[in-house]
Amino acid sequence: MQIKQENDGHAIIDHLTGEEVLTCAINIGEQLLMSGAEISRVEDTIRRICAAYDIRQSHIFSIASCIIVTLETKDHKWITQTRRILSYGTDMWKLDRLNNLSRLICSTKPPLERINREYALILNGPVYPPVVQCLIYAMTADAFAIFFGGNLLDGFSAMFVGALIRITLYAFTAIKMKPIFSNILCSMISGMVCILTHYIGLGHHVEMIMIGNIMLLIPGVLMTNSFRDFISGDMISGLLHFSEAIITAICIAAGFIFSKILLGGIL
């Protein structure tokens, strides 16, 4: 092992074992996948990190819910790690930082201590506070309601319901409700509130209020990722993402249909 001095005078190891390279690469790949990266990018990033540290062979298999990596080290030893991905979404800030970290690793081959430090900073990165997220949901719902033909009063009602959707999703996440049920219940609750706001005179066009809030829940990024996976040749991941997007859309539609059935009589 080679030892070198950092700027602060502390000695650090400038050599990574095969196990350390594997853990480093799969950690970054896992966070990329959880942040919304396409499968081809995840596999390519892991492969490049392994190549940077002179791994003889790397075999990576990744789908939306799992990553399996097997490496052959310089001493002809084979090692494998598997990661189960339980949840994922879209985090562009984290994607950008992870991509920068992977480029840094490939270009400079930093020591493990620095990699872990940069990785920890990314994991503990800034998150929008709940109030800001509610405000973003409200403004987005308002914009879509007006865009699709509603008036200012419809937009105001959509803002209220949009903030309520964010609060409802927070509550469902806190109790770890399964996505299929949270999508149905969130859609049904927001649909009922849309109908009630129209009933008490806070909106003129209930359809526009509903559309503005449906757009908050539509899995557009997930559908786009599925086609991106198809184009990259990752058919299994593409089918998984496509199926999830379709099922999510069906759940959203079912929730709003239930709200119309329950409160449709007051329209």
Predicted feature descriptions by range:
Residues 113, 154, 221-225:
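Short helix-terminus and kink motifs of transmembrane alpha helices
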Residues 198-267:
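Generic detector of multi-pass transmembrane helix bundles and their immediately adjacent loops
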Residues 126-202:
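Core alpha-helical transmembrane segments of integral membrane proteins
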Residues 118-122, 165-176, 224-236:
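C-terminal ends of transmembrane helices
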Residues 88-136:
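Hydrophobic alpha-helical segments and helix pairs
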Residues 1-108:
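Soluble N-terminal domains of membrane-associated systems
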Residues 83-87, 148-153, 205-208, 242, ...:
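Interfacial loop-to-helix junctions that mark the boundaries of transmembrane helices
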